[in-house]
């Protein structure tokens, strides 16, 4: 059975006019290596930590500024939200299609809340806590091309032409602000698009972005702003002692107009200085050590890296299944070809390397979890190939071969062919990222013994379900297995309303 909404009734939960307060027992385990009668033993000790959660239920008017607004992802997301808001339908060769948010965790997925008369009860994911309605979001952003969003939508060749015709009046007056352009960080083939750029030194560019954000907030009367990078993949920045290794050195390098500070890092600096959440949707190392240090010192949310939409999402499920089933993956070969602007930019070796790193690390934690299958330091052979084929446009092809060792020296091979409509998969992920980033800024908590409430760590691991290479605080384990990432996100939000984590034991039926 599916219900649209619910309210938790518990002595541990209190609803007020502007808040939900919950007291939550977090049950975990501590592992110690102890000397017992002269012999060291591993001992696992269950423990319970009491947490207080406080969620502000006042939903703000949200502004979202996209870096690369005129790209395939930005134009597709904007078009999709408008189509939903206006209730637009359009004819395809198969049927009359209604606008929807399929592919969005927050808007189109469900959670289990319990059982009723022997039937499982589910509710929308977004019913857990008050979230911003996508149709109330004010979109804007920057681009190195001055093309309006209607023409950008047509150039992208993602949406059906009947839908594009209906959306054009809503989008033709949407024009991105000029963006920061540095040809050293992206492929040379992007130069033909760069007709709307912010001039000046890097310090002047940061100041320009800050001015743009302040004016956007004032013009649109938004309460909060989230900025997300959905522009070209950049090459990796060199992390150099004295250049970008500390906050002091990074800001000094901006002042000195050092060439190795990337455009994405400049946008992120501007956001952190303004206390505005910044999310990196591409694979480059935007968050150099000095920037992470700055975000932590300012308690400003940062998240990334790289949208997890197609091939990598499948990989984070399949390898988790194989290792969890006691099957040993020994070779993973991933081949992609695509024909959109992302593919053209990735045809340059230096930008492809950023994507290769992002895609290749996704199985590390799953391999490390099973010392029966893998010796220390052992790892499957893992190769990623990306080629540019203009004809296929946004319809990316992903082909994977997984070779594994099975019982008694046997071999198992799984081959997948995945046609990923690149921007149609990425757009709802962008939506989820900005909505969850905003929501997380309204949640505070404290553990038993802590005096004051505080927010989540500025490095937002809560967003890791949506990213290929999750950014985590220093010293924090990286989790890539998709099921674990979703469980973490859902269970944290459940804790905010006093619900137990979904453990799937269902003891009432045993």
UniProtKB/Swiss-Prot annotation:
Catalytic activity as recorded in UniProt: D-glucose 6-phosphate = 1D-myo-inositol 3-phosphate
GO cellular component: cytoplasm
Biological process, per Gene Ontology: cellular response to phosphate starvation; defense response to bacterium; defense response to fungus; defense response to virus; embryo development ending in seed dormancy; inositol biosynthetic process; myo-inositol hexakisphosphate biosynthetic process; phospholipid biosynthetic process
Keywords carried by this UniProt record: Cytoplasm, Inositol biosynthesis, Isomerase, Lipid biosynthesis, Lipid metabolism, NAD, Phospholipid biosynthesis, Phospholipid metabolism
Keyword Cell cycle (UniProt): no
Top EC class of this enzyme: isomerase
Protein name as it appears in the record: Inositol-3-phosphate synthase isozyme 2
UniProt organism field: Arabidopsis thaliana
């Amino acid at each position: 059975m599916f219900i649209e909404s619910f309210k938790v009734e518990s002595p541990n939960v209190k609803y007020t006019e502007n808040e939900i307060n919950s007291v939550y027992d977090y049950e975990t385990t501590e592992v110690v290596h102890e000397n017992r009668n002269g012999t060291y033993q591993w001992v696992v000790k269950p423990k319970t930590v009491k947490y207080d959660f406080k969620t502000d239920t006042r939903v703000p008017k949200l502004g979202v500024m996209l870096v690369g607004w005129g790209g395939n992802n930005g134009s597709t997301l904007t078009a999709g939200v408008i189509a939903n808001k206006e209730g637009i339908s359009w004819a395809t060769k198969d049927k009359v299609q209604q606008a929807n948010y399929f592919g969005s965790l927050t808007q189109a997925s469900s959670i289990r809340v319990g059982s009723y008369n022997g039937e499982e009860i589910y509710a929308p994911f977004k019913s857990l806590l008050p979230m911003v309605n996508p149709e109330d979001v004010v979109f804007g952003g920057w681009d190195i091309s001055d093309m309006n969003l209607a023409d950008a939508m047509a150039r992208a060749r993602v949406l059906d032409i009947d839908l594009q015709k209906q959306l054009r009046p809503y989008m033709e007056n949407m024009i991105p602000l000029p963006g920061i352009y540095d040809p050293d960080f992206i492929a040379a083939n992007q130069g033909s698009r760069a007709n709307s750029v912010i001039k000046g030194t890097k310090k002047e560019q940061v100041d320009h972005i800050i001015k743009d954000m302040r004016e956007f907030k004032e013009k649109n009367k938004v309460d909060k702003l989230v900025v997300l990078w959905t522009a070209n993949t950049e090459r990796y920045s060199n992390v150099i002692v004295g250049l970008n290794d500390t906050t002091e050195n990074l800001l000094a390098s901006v002042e000195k107009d050092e060439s190795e500070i990337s455009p994405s890092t400049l946008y992120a600096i501007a956001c952190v200085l303004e206390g505005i959440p910044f999310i990196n949707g591409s694979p480059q190392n935007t968050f150099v050590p000095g920037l992470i240090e700055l975000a932590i010192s300012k308690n400003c949310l940062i998240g990334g890296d790289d949208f997890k939409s197609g091939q990598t999402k499948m990989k984070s499920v399949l390898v988790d299944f194989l290792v969890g089933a006691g099957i040993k993956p020994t070779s993973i070969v991933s081949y992609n070809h695509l024909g959109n602007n992302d593919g053209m930019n990735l045809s340059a070796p230096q930008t492809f390397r950023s994507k290769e790193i992002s895609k290749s690390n996704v199985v590390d934690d799953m391999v490390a979890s099973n010392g029966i299958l893998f010796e220390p330091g052992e790892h499957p052979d893992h190769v990623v190939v990306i080629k540019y084929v203009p004809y296929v446009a946004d319809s990316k092809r992903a082909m994977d071969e997984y070779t594994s060792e099975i019982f008694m020296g046997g071999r198992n091979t799984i081959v997948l062919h995945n046609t990923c409509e690149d921007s149609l998969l990425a757009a709802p992920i962008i939506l989820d990222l900005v909505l969850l980033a905003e929501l997380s800024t309204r949640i505070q908590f404290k553990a038993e013994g802590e005096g004051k409430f505080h927010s989540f760590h500025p490095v937002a691991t809560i967003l890791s379900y949506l990213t290929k290479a999750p950014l985590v605080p220093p010293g924090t384990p990286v989790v890539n297995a998709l099921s674990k990432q979703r469980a973490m996100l859902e269970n944290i939000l459940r804790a905010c309303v006093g619900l137990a984590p979904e453990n799937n034991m269902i003891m009432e039926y045993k």
